[in-house]
Every structure is written in structure tokens, then in C-alpha cells.
Amino acid sequence: MEASAKLTFARLSPRKTRLVVDMVRGKGIQDALTILRFSPQASAKLVSKLLRSAVANAEQKGASDVDRLYVKSISVDGGPVLKRFVPRAMGRASKIRKPTSHITVVLADKQ
């Protein structure tokens, strides 16, 4: 049985978030949450929250044993980029890019 969860429009850089996501891909739920708990990256907190949401979704779907779940797939896609301007000297302006991410998690039972 599979359960999934999505986080959309997260104000995180997709490039930096992929570094965190790669650490937990294919791991068991307890191992993944432990890795994320001790990870210093800002995206680790949101990814662990998303994993817990996926586990809750699995329980709602009727998963018999939550401890047997593992991260089957987890992906980070780029969302829209918020563009802002900051004033600079002599009437100029510089562009500030604020990237967003879409994170998708799929959990499955170990066979």
C-alpha cells in the first residue's frame, strides 16, 4: 500500500532542498526522521513535517504497520520564482529572486 503527501509553494530553494531530500530517499521512516532531526538545513524541518503527514495519511488509509513504511520516492520540483527589486545607487535597481519548491513524498510497505 502506498501513501503520499505534497508540499507546494514552499519558500525554499529547490537546489538546496534536493540536498536534504537525497539523504532520506529509500530509508525507513524512523531513520529518515532521525536524519532530518539532526540536519542543520532549514528545509529539513519542513521535509520532516511532510514525512509525518505522509505517515498520518498511511494510517488513515489503513496501513497495518507504520514501522514497515519506507520512503519509496521523494522529489523536489521548482515552483514559480517571486521576483522583487531592491533600490541601488544612482537610481538603479537590482533583481532579487525568491524561489519556491514543490515537494512530493510517496511511502510504501517493505515487502
Curated annotation (Swiss-Prot):
Q: Name one Pfam family in it.
A: Ribosomal_L22
Among Gene3D superfamilies, the record links this protein to:
Ribosomal protein L22/L17
What are the recorded GO MF terms, alphabetically? rRNA binding; structural constituent of ribosome
InterPro entries on file: Ribosomal_uL22, Ribosomal_uL22_bac/chlpt-type, Ribosomal_uL22_bac/org-type, Ribosomal_uL22_CS, Ribosomal_uL22_sf
Q: Record's GO cellular component, any one?
A: cytosolic large ribosomal subunit
Keywords from UniProt, A to Z, are: Ribonucleoprotein, Ribosomal protein, RNA-binding, rRNA-binding
Which GO BP terms apply?
Answer: translation
Function, as annotated, reads: This protein binds specifically to 23S rRNA; its binding is stimulated by other ribosomal proteins, e.g. L4, L17, and L20. It is important during the early stages of 50S assembly. It makes multiple contacts with different domains of the 23S rRNA in the assembled 50S subunit and ribosome. The globular domain of the protein is located near the polypeptide exit tunnel on the outside of the subunit, while an extended beta-hairpin is found that lines the wall of the exit tunnel in the center of the 70S ribosome.
How is the quaternary structure described? Part of the 50S ribosomal subunit.
PANTHER family xrefs:
CHLOROPLAST 50S RIBOSOMAL PROTEIN L22-RELATED, LARGE RIBOSOMAL SUBUNIT PROTEIN UL22M
Against HAMAP family, the record matches this protein to: Ribosomal_uL22_B
Family per record: Belongs to the universal ribosomal protein uL22 family.
The protein's name is Large ribosomal subunit protein uL22
Q: Which organism is it from?
A: Geobacter sulfurreducens (strain ATCC 51573 / DSM 12127 / PCA)
Gene transcribed to yield this protein = rplV
